Amino acid sequence: MKTVSEQMELARKAQAIVNDYTQEQIDEICLAIGWEVYEDENIAKLAKMAVEETGYGNVQSKIIKHKRKVGGVLHDIKGAKSVGLIERNEETGISKYAKPVGVVCAILPATNPTATCGGKAVGILKGRNAVIFKPSSRALKSTTEAINMMRAGLRKVGAPEDLIQVLEDPSREAITELMKVSDLIVATGSGQVVRAAYSSGTPAYGVGQGNACAIVAEDADVAEAAKMICGSKLFDYATSCSSENAVIPVEAVYDQFMAEMKKNGCYLVTGEDREKLKNHMWKPNAKGKIALNPDIIAKSAQVIADGAGISIPEGTDILLVEGMEPILGDKFHDEKISPVLTVYKAKDFKDAYRILVELTNLVGRGHSCGIHTYKHEYIEFLGEHMKSSRITVRQSMSAGNGGHPFNRMPSTATLGCGTWGGNSTTENVHWRHFINVTWVNEPVAPWTFTDEDMWGDFWKKYGK
C-alpha cells in the first residue's frame, strides 16, 4: 500500500508530463478514458458491481447514468479550448491562457460512485491535471474497477496512467493529508465531507444538501408533469440529490395530479401506515439524534414498505404521503433519498411559493427547485425571488439539474449551492472549474468619462 506522499509524487510526475501536451493530445486522453466508462460491457459490469457492493439503486438506472454523465461531459468538452490561448479580444487587448490547477483530490459518494468517478475524471483531465480519487468505503471495489478501466485507456494512448489514481490508504489521517497536499478538492458527498474539504486549507468545491421540490401550476400539462416526476423519483431509487423530495400541486389540479400519479405507480400512504412509515424512515442514530435510516436509502418501495410493516399494492413504485403543516413539525419535509415523495396541496401559485420557500429553508438551501408551468410570469418570479442555484422548468429534476440533452446545463454530478448552501459557487462544477486562467492585458485606447457623464442624472435627482 502506497502512502499519500508516494501517490502524490506519482501524480505530480504524471501531471508534469501532460503539462506540455497539445490540445489534440489532451482531447485524445479524454476520449480514451471516457470510452472505458461509456462502453456497454464495461458500464454493465460497473453498474452491477456498484449495486451489489453498496446496496443502493438499481443496475439499469446506473447504466443509463453512465451514458448521461460521461457522455454529457464529453459532449460539453468537445471542441472546447483548455490548453494555451483560449480567448483573444482585440478590442480590449485581453488574452486568456489556460493552465492546469495541478493535482485534484476528488471525494466520491456511495450513492453514485462509478458514473461520478468517470465524469469527473474526464473533466479534470481536460485541464491537463492529475486526480486522486477518494471513494466511499462502501463503494471501494466498484470505484477502483472504474479507475482501473480508465488507467487502461490512458495506457492505450501512451499517456501516464498515474494521472488517475485511487487513494490506497483508507484511513481518516490519509484523506486529511491528501486534502492538505492537493492543489484543489472537489467533494461530492455528505455535509461532513464537504465541511472537511472546506476546512482543509486547500481551495475546494463542494455540494450542499439536496431537497429538490417542484410546483405544479394550474396551467401545467398534469399528465406529463406526473410522468416526469415519477420517472425522476424512481430513477436509481432516488440516489440523486436532485430527485424530487416534495411536489406542490395547486388546488385547481390537485385531484387530477394525484390520479395521474397513481397511474404512474404511486400509492398514497395514510393514517397509521403513514406513522409507521415515518418511524421506519427516521430513527435515532449512534449519537441519539433522529436521522434518516440508512436501511431505506435508495431501496425499492416494496423493501421500504416491508421494513415499515405496511401493505402496499403489487406493482407500487413510489410511496406518497400528504404533507402536513406546520411543515417543521412533520419529518416528511426532509430529504429522503428513496422513492418516497411528499405532496403538499397549495391554494394557488402564491401559496405554493410559500410552501416551497419554507421547505427549502429547512433543508436543501440553495440547491434547486422546479416548476411545471407555461406561465412566464411564474418562471420569472421564481428566477427573481427563489434562493435556488438552479430552477428547472417542465423537466425531470434528477436529469435536468445536472445537464441533459434536453437542456444546456453543464453536465456534472457536483451541484454547487452557493452561499445559501455553504458552498463557494452556485454553478454546476464542470471542466472549466479545473483550469487556472492567466489574463494577459495589452494597452489599448484609454477609456475616459466626464463628471457630467458619470453623475449628471444623479445630480438632477439629488443635487451635488
Swiss-Prot record:
Gene3D superfamilies cross-referenced by the UniProt entry: Aldehyde Dehydrogenase, Chain A, domain 1 (3.40.605.10), Aldehyde Dehydrogenase, Chain A, domain 2 (3.40.309.10)
Residues forming the catalytic site: C241 (nucleophile)
EC number: 1.2.1.81
pH effects: Optimum pH is 9.5.
Enzyme class, UniProt record, top EC level: oxidoreductase
GO molecular function: oxidoreductase activity, acting on the aldehyde or oxo group of donors, NAD or NADP as acceptor
Keywords (A to Z) from UniProt: NADP, Oxidoreductase
Pfam family name, one: Aldedh
Reaction(s) this enzyme catalyzes, per UniProt: sulfoacetaldehyde + NADP(+) + CoA = sulfoacetyl-CoA + NADPH + H(+)
Induction note: Induced in sulfoacetate-grown cells but not in thiosulfate-grown cells.
Cited function: Involved in the degradation of sulfoacetate. Catalyzes the conversion of sulfoacetyl-CoA and NADPH to sulfoacetaldehyde, CoA and NADP(+). A much lower level of activity (1%) is observed when NADP(+) is replaced with NAD(+).
Similarity comment text for this entry: Belongs to the aldehyde dehydrogenase family.
Protein name per the record: Sulfoacetaldehyde dehydrogenase (acylating)
Organism: Bilophila wadsworthia (strain 3_1_6)
